[in-house]
Amino acid sequence: MGAAGLLEIKKRIKSVENTRKITNAMGLVATSKLRKTKNELAVNNKFIDITEPVVRNLATTAGEEGSNVYFEGNDSQNKLYVVITSDSGLCGGFNSSVVSQLVSQIKDKKDTAKIVLVGSKGLGYLKRIKIEPVGEYVGIEDVPTVSEAKEIFDKALEMYLNGDVSEVNIVYSDFISSVKQETKSVKILPISKSEGTTGSFLIEPDLDIVLEDALNIYLKGKIRSILLSSKCSEQSTRMTAMDGATKNADDLLDKLKLKFNRIRQGAITQEISEIVGGAAAQN
């Protein structure tokens, strides 16, 4: 392989180096976003830890004083699944694992499953399994806001209170650590009465008013925690994917540079041999 071959390898080395710069930069950005979102998740979880016991106590009191749609549900045969995917790609198997979790949940019950999709990347997956979402939310911030959580909650609650669905479930990737994420389905409505603590409480001025306000606050906070956890999982998966891509680029660069040096050394050796041979012929 002569000069033309060396030039081709040089071009490949340059291309891989440019790709490596991109994957390395994306990995650093994902790391920064993960750190910021993790901090917000920790703060929001503290809020949930405070409000959840209040809701559990209200659940016990509501059960003792009569039925309530938040705990009893309704007669609809349909179930709502809020499926949280990403708006951006290059995050490994993040989206496919979430959709696989959804498929395992609905199985042969597609006719009674209503899907609200969060994130644009999940739409292609849903089309492949012939599911049309009843609602879509795209462009969620890297650190999901309370207003974004409220918008999703309002849609789900409206369908539940109208009797369109008897359950509200959220399918997402739960962030456990930077090296471990778990896809799961969590039911947020109706709320199980078994979650309530023992004993009853006197609620004034009215249980229904207090209950509705407390549930709205709690469930919006719960949905925001899930959105934040999903974003952490997404950024963690992207960080891992970009780190792997960068390492692969490094390995490829090493091989290309070794090949380049071998060819160049071979060309130099050949030139020296030709010079020596020419000198010997003249003698």
From Swiss-Prot:
Produces ATP from ADP in the presence of a proton gradient across the membrane. The gamma chain is believed to be important in regulating ATPase activity and the flow of protons through the CF(0) complex. F-type ATPases have 2 components, CF(1) - the catalytic core - and CF(0) - the membrane proton channel. CF(1) has five subunits: alpha(3), beta(3), gamma(1), delta(1), epsilon(1). CF(0) has three main subunits: a, b and c. HAMAP family: ATP_synth_gamma_bact. It is found in: Cell membrane. The keyword Membrane applies. Belongs to the ATPase gamma chain family. It is a peripheral membrane protein. This is ATP synthase gamma chain. GO terms for cellular component: plasma membrane; proton-transporting ATP synthase complex. CDD domains: F1-ATPase_gamma (cd12151). Keywords: ATP synthesis, Cell membrane, CF(1), Hydrogen ion transport, Ion transport, Membrane, Transport. The lineage of its organism: Bacteria, Bacillati, Bacillota, Clostridia, Eubacteriales. GO terms for biological process: proton motive force-driven plasma membrane ATP synthesis. The keyword Membrane applies. It comes from Clostridium beijerinckii (strain ATCC 51743 / NCIMB 8052). GO terms for molecular function: ATP binding; proton-transporting ATP synthase activity, rotational mechanism.
